[in-house]
Amino acid sequence: SLNDVTPESLEKGIYKKFSFLKDQVEVSPETNKLILPISVQETSSKTIYRKDPESKKTIIEGMNSNGVEEFFSTGDMLGTILNDVFADINIYDDDIRLLQRRFVSPIGSGAISFYKFYLMDTVMVDKNKCVHLTFVPQNPQDFGFTGHLYVLDDSTYAVKKCTMNLPKKTGVNFVENLDVVQQYEQLPNGNWVLTDDDMTVDLLVMKAIQGIQVKRTTKYSNYVFEPIEPRLFRLKGNVIKEADMLTKSDEYWAGVRQ
């Protein structure tokens, strides 16, 4: 989406070619600013993992794109930035690698010495009783997140929900704001797994170019812990694209989005 859009800006430049875009303006729930959705890209994939010998592969089953791609014809620089921004975040790691920097995880081994934690309340998240904690860096000048943790109020201390924000004052190049929201569910076998991973970032690549808001929404489902066919790990490359990934039907995408 184009970020911080004004009615006046829609009368200028490239916007004149797409007058219908005026009706597409909406308010961003993350920033409360006006944004103009330009492009939607979807990917459906399956990830397989083997611990010994260690191997991980992602099989892309479907890809879909809708929108006005002309707005994003800014060369490889934007693509490089987005790949760096939208790295996978695992809060159970001690360190989170993001934007070519190292951030201390709010539940990592070094979290107590790096963050200040405040006990807010006991709340219900879905059907789970959770302790609500907020956290901020001990030193405001340090590279760190601010956010909220919702931890189960029982002996497991499992994380039910985590929200994190990277403020503008952190000084990361191109990034005006970054928000992460992750939610976890318990499987029938007792394991807690990530099910929802939303990341929203406001970018200002160049001062003379319209700011951009990019949102990545990831849904994880169908966790299976049964043995995997060895032949799948013999496929070449870490990312395998199925031959018909660009020709999936509307019915396929309707099922995937549920």
Question: How should these model regions be labeled?
Answer:
Residues 114-186:
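Feature captures eukaryotic membrane-trafficking machinery centered on endolysosomal pathways
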